[in-house]
Curated annotation (Swiss-Prot):
Residues that coordinate or bind substrate: 13-18
Source organism of this protein record: Chlorobaculum parvum (strain DSM 263 / NCIMB 8327) (Chlorobium vibrioforme subsp. thiosulfatophilum)
Subunit structure: Monomer.
Region entry Interaction with substrate tRNA, spans: 36-39, 160-164
Protein name: tRNA dimethylallyltransferase
Length: 313
């Protein structure tokens, strides 16, 4: 008998993925494969909206608290290891449920990777020099002109992927978007059912605003202060990409004296809304998903849990 497909629950930040995946896993006796590139790091708890301890104790979550900040872990590492764990769980008769919103993690697992050209040190050095001279906005506008679809998925302030995208265009003569259409495919022997939670924009933004306030009340400032005291040199030299995460970046800048705490909180909410918009653009343009209405109340959650359990159990 052929195995049922693996359920993948994706959606923008604050859309309810964590709660939905937990309930399905609890009902089916399953385990959760977390596709979140920041929750994998220890000491980044409040700002990454990790599931609470009682959830982690009740249902096994993979790829949460498995790495120290600074340990390398790429989208390729995730795709390979997630496929291995899915196979292991199935061999033990356990239902795996993938849930998360990290775009490159999800794309790597579901579609595989495109063959991208190797980095060219001369081109990369020149682009970095142009970044220093003209700033990230100028390079972002250039990418918008050449590859608007890729630009929509990027945070203009995170320059590593911006430079890499422009480098690929110069080396290959084509865009990242065009190259990504030719991927290596999903892992052998695993089929996926991919659903994405769709919420009215005003509801999603209100959830983001409320969650930002809740994070601050839960101690995000103190959590970030601990990280700032430990990693301020790495932050200033931009050596740790994890520290550029929304929620931490703004508070690091507050500790550096760039603005007051109230402004930092407002920026966290604003930047999180921007991130959610980029996630939605990515899911719609780059992944093959079934959009479902995100539940707005308890009855809606229970109905969706029942419906999705039928697909996989």
């Amino acid at each position: 008998m052929s195995q049922k497909p693996v359920l993948v629950i994706l959606g923008p930040t604050a859309s309810g993925k964590t709660e939905l995946a937990f309930r399905i896993a609890r009902k089916t006796g399953g385990e959760i494969i977390s596709a979140d590139s920041r929750q994998i790091y220890r000491s980044m708890d409040i700002g990454t909206a990790k599931p609470p301890k009682w959830m982690l104790n009740e249902v096994k979550h993979h790829f949460i608290d498995e790495k120290e900040i600074g340990e390398p872990f790429s989208a390729g590492d995730f795709a390979e290891q997630a496929a291995e764990r899915i196979r292991e769980l199935r061999q033990r008769g356990i239902t795996p449920i993938v849930a998360g919103g990290s775009t490159l993690y999800l794309e790597g697992l579901l579609k595989g990777f495109a063959e991208l050209p190797q980095s060219n040190p001369e081109i990369r050095a020149r682009l970095k020099h142009e970044l220093e001279l003209h700033g990230a906005e100028a390079l972002y506008r250039r990418l918008e002109a050449f590859d608007p679809e890729q630009a929509k998925t990027l945070d203009p302030t995170k320059t590593q992927r911006l430079i890499r995208s422009l480098e690929i265009i110069e080396i290959s003569g084509t865009t990242v978007t065009a190259l990504q259409r030719k991927t290596s495919g999903p892992p052998p022997g695993i089929e996926f059912t991919v659903i994405a939670l769709d919420l009215p924009r005003e509801v999603l933004y209100e959830r983001i605003n409320r969650r930002t306030s809740e994070m601050m009340h839960a101690g995000l400032e103190a959590e970030t202060r601990h990280l700032f005291d430990k990693f301020r040199d790495e932050w200033r030299s931009k050596k740790l990409n994890a520290l550029a995460t929304v929620g931490y970046r703004e508070l690091f800048e507050h500790f550096e004296g760039l603005y007051n705490l109230e402004t930092a909180e407002a920026l966290i909410a604003q930047h999180t809304r921007n991130y959610a918009k980029r996630q939605l653009t990515f899911f719609r343009n780059r992944l093959d998903v079934e959009w479902v209405k995100g539940p707005l109340d308890e009855a809606g959650i229970e109905a969706l849990v029942e419906s999705l359990c039928e697909k996989i159990a």
